[in-house]
UniProtKB/Swiss-Prot annotation:
Residues 1-33 have a biased composition (Basic and acidic residues). Belongs to the EMX homeobox family. Signal peptide: none annotated. The gene is vax1-b. The keyword DNA damage does not apply. PANTHER family: HOMEOBOX PROTEIN EMX-RELATED, VENTRAL ANTERIOR HOMEOBOX 1. This is Ventral anterior homeobox 1b. It comes from the Eukaryota. Pfam families: Homeodomain. The lineage of its organism: Eukaryota, Metazoa, Chordata, Craniata, Vertebrata. Residues 89-148 bind DNA. Its main location: nucleus. One of its GO terms (biological process) is brain development. Involved in ventral eye development.
């Protein structure tokens, strides 16, 4: 039994090997030889390069060549995609009528964002497209933001200028607290009394005090000659004190002195006067 099966297996293998190793017909061999090229060009030969150049010279369908003159005047060839339509005319700018602008401005004041049915209805009433209405509102919002930025800068400049002008006006009118030795800055008094100094101790003197009975009027002119800056004649007993007051620019009282020092020490008053410390004033009084 085993020998018969072995003989059958050997026969099958021989038949299969014969089928595989069977040569092709002469016709098939000739056809395959005719299809194969007889010679192959070398990789670096001129024929291969010429074929590659000829194939690359043909531009693809999505590209086109144009001649452009550069800054030096020489012509250059540029390859651009055909999708870039350079010959297309520019879109004409939309010109709105006065009625359309008035209606659009009124709607913008009411609501800065018009969308949906409101925009459709507004475009229909004004005989415009929704795109035109949308673009107009976008440009109007951009313009408003720019105007607000300019207004804020202008307000800051105007406020600084107004503050400077008010300070200069007050300095000219003499309403600011200033030393009495500076007649241009001291307000003239209509009526007042000059009180004699009270001696608090030996070797110490106190400054005279002034009491005004009427409020200051800015329209009054300075006092005539023969009167002091307080618009009252100086008594004979206080002649030396008046000379000291005219020679030393001192304030009338301690509170006024502190206030004037605060005012004069600020940056707005630096170009017009200099602040004097308490120590220097006390030294001048003792001298």
């Amino acid at each position: 039994m085993f020998e018969k099966t072995r003989d059958m297996d050997v026969r099958c293998n021989i038949e299969e090997n014969g089928r595989i190793s069977k040569p092709k017909d002469n016709k098939e061999i000739r056809e395959s030889q005719s299809k194969m090229p007889s010679t192959y060009p070398a990789p670096g030969s001129s024929e291969g390069c010429a074929k590659n150049k000829s194939s690359s010279a043909v531009d693809p369908e999505y590209c086109r060549r144009i001649l452009v003159r550069d800054a030096k005047g020489s012509l250059r060839e540029i390859i651009l995609p055909k999708g870039l339509d350079l010959d297309r005319p520019k879109r004409t700018r939309t010109s709105f009528t006065a009625e359309q602008l008035y209606r659009l401005e009124m709607e913008f004041q009411r609501c800065q964002y018009v969308v949906g049915r409101e925009r459709t209805e507004l475009a229909r009433q004004l005989n415009l497209s929704e795109t035109q209405v949308k673009v107009w509102f976008q440009n109007r919002r951009t313009k408003q933001k720019k105007d607000q930025g300019k207004d804020s800068e202008l307000r800051s400049v105007v406020s600084e200028t107004a503050a400077t002008c008010s300070v200069l006006r007050l300095l000219e009118q003499g309403r600011l607290l200033s030393p009495p030795g500076l007649p241009g800055l001291m307000p003239p008094c209509t009526t007042g009394t000059l009180r004699a100094p009270n001696s608090s101790g030996p070797g110490t003197t106190s400054l005279p005090t002034v009491t005004n009975t009427h409020p200051h009027q800015p329209g009054l002119h300075p006092s005539p000659t023969g009167h002091n800056i307080f618009n009252m004649p100086v008594p004979s007993l206080l002649g030396t004190v008046a000379n000291r007051l005219s020679s030393h620019p001192l304030t009338m009282a301690g509170n006024l002195q502190e206030l004037s020092a605060r005012y004069l020490s600020s940056s707005a008053f630096e170009p017009y006067s200099r602040s004097i410390s308490k120590d220097s004033l006390d030294k001048k009084l003792l001298d």
